[in-house]
């Protein structure tokens, strides 16, 4: 996605995901193109997953999970339906290359690999300024 125009941000994100502050790990949603969705997070000093001025691994994992949830939430709200609760079945082959510092903006692409009934298998790429930090 070349166009990084935010379509939902701030309080509007709370309509897409079940989490509530202080655990909200998505602050912007850029939309969906086919089997890809795009979201973001600006790392702030008050983030509960920040230590030593960096977002820790658990925060990146939670950001990916909430990015996937935001995709589902967007699809359901667009159809006028209630957003379902979801959960992570497993995390496989996660690679974290760098921990983003306070003030950095994460841009995350969620790709749907497979959907069977209500189970969705995804892959994710998390970037900061086009540098891959996790997948």
Regions inferred by a protein language model and the residue ranges of each:
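HotDog/MaoC-like acyl-thioester-processing domains
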Residues: 2-3, 70, 77, 101-104, ...
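Conserved beta-strand residues within beta-sheet cores
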Residues: 23-26, 88-93, 107-109, 119, ...
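Short aromatic-glycine motifs in intrinsically disordered, low-complexity regions
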Residues: 10-20, 82
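Conserved positions in beta-strands of structured domains
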Residues: 14, 27-30, 92, 97, ...
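Compact, glycine-rich, soluble single-domain proteins
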Residues: 52-71, 88
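Hydrophobic beta-strand-centered segment that forms part of the acyl-chain substrate-binding groove
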Residues: 4-6, 70-107
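Catalytic strand-loop segment that frames the active site of acyl-thioester-processing enzymes
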Residues: 20-56
């Amino acid at each position: 996605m070349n166009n990084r125009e935010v379509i939902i941000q701030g309080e509007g994100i709370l309509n897409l995901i079940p989490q509530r502050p202080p655990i909200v790990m998505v602050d912007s949603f850029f939309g969906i193109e086919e089997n890809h969705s795009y979201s973001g997070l600006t790392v702030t000093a008050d983030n509960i997953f920040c230590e030593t001025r960096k977002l820790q691994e658990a925060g990146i994992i939670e950001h990916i999970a909430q990015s996937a949830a935001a995709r589902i939430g967007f699809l359901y709200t667009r159809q006028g339906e209630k957003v379902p609760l979801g959960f992570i079945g497993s995390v496989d082959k996660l690679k974290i290359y760098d921990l983003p510092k306070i003030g950095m903006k994460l841009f995350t692409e969620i790709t749907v690999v497979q959907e069977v009934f209500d189970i969705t298998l995804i892959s994710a790429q998390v970037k900061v300024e086009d540098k891959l930090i996790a997948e």
